[in-house]
Amino acid sequence: MIEPNLRGNGKVALVTGAARGIGLGISAWLIAEGWQVVLADNDRERGARVAEALGEHAWFVAMDVAQEGQVAMSVAEVLGQFGRLDGLVCNAAIANPRNTPLEALSLGEWTRTLAVNLTGPMLLAKYCTPYLRAHNGAIVNIASTRAHQSEPDSEAYAASKGGLLALTHALAASLGPDIRVNALSPGWIDTREAAEREAAPLTELDHDQHLVGRVGTVEDVASLVAWLLSEDAGFVTGQEFLVDGGMTRKMIYLD
């Protein structure tokens, strides 16, 4: 449940990959806290639809984060519309080719994954920095616990998220003290819509893999993102926060 407050107080945040899942959850939470939120996504139809559903404090901009020209143009649109930028959440990512064996992994698939998941956040930081600096803003990069542990055939995704953690502390060093930069690494987060969850509910075994006894929700991620963007986190930068219910700290033995 979102606890309403005015921590955002009219500030402006840009959230990428915001048309669904974690990005949509972050956007909704920030709006509830009083932020103006720009939802960026390469899915124009869905992005415009969800922005309209979120109400007057949501605004949509189409963007492929791996295309420098689109990033530059979209950031300029945001500034033209709002005149300021206080927060950047780099959430857009692709997992493919997550289950492609290394022998079958094409260079194009590898390159596209790193372009979206790693180059994208760099480009966004590059073009947003002058405006974030003017308001002592903050950046939150959405990484993954896959930067620390892997399943087979996940080379591209794991490498991109590991790189994003390194980019995070490099940006924190380069952009401080004016801009704070942190990373948040989700574990298993149930991003499915209500109908999907009802049709295929999670099992007791799914929940038991976590020390807290349940799979995560988008609100678990969104609430921490909101704190990291706020002045309450003013002494926090260059850090990674794992939001995984303790899953990466639990030893599991299969019978």
Swiss-Prot record:
Keyword Chaperone carried by entry: no
Q: Which residues bind substrate?
A: S144
- Which protein, by its recorded name, is this? Uncharacterized oxidoreductase PA3106
EC assignment: the record states 1.-.-.-
Detail which positions bind NADP(+).
15-39
Q: Give the source species.
A: Pseudomonas aeruginosa (strain ATCC 15692 / DSM 22644 / CIP 104116 / JCM 14847 / LMG 12228 / 1C / PRS 101 / PAO1)
Q: Which family would the database say this protein is a member of?
A: Belongs to the short-chain dehydrogenases/reductases (SDR) family.
**Active site (catalytic residues):** Y157
- Asked whether the UniProt record includes Oxidoreductase among its keywords, one would answer yes
State the superkingdom.
Bacteria
* PANTHER family the UniProt entry points to: DEHYDROGENASES, SHORT CHAIN, ESTRADIOL 17-BETA-DEHYDROGENASE 8-RELATED
Keywords noted in UniProt: NADP, Oxidoreductase
The GO molecular function terms of this record are: oxidoreductase activity
- Top EC class of this enzyme: oxidoreductase
User: Matching Pfam families, A to Z?
Assistant: adh_short_C2
